[in-house]
Amino acid sequence: MLVKLVELHKPEGDRVHLDEIYVSSAAVTTIRTESGATMLEEARQLGINGEAKFSRITISEGGMTRTAVVVGSPSEIKTKLNKKMLLRD
């Protein structure tokens, strides 16, 4: 199942951008609290609530891994990844 998350993405030498990403719940191997002050402060300048929490997730992609900083606490992200969807006729 793919889950939509909001990623904080900062290209080399650029400002922070917010992007929607779709992640397979089976591909996420770790979730931990992100506290990188500079990037998070830039995200708040984009209008993200000052109370928002951020997590760093590790995604396994065909033998390689990558990390992404996403909006939400580790427990919120875990809940999203484990949410069951009902299929209707």
Language-model features: where?
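Acidic, Ser/Thr- and proline-rich intrinsically disordered linker/docking segments
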Residues: 2-3, 9-89
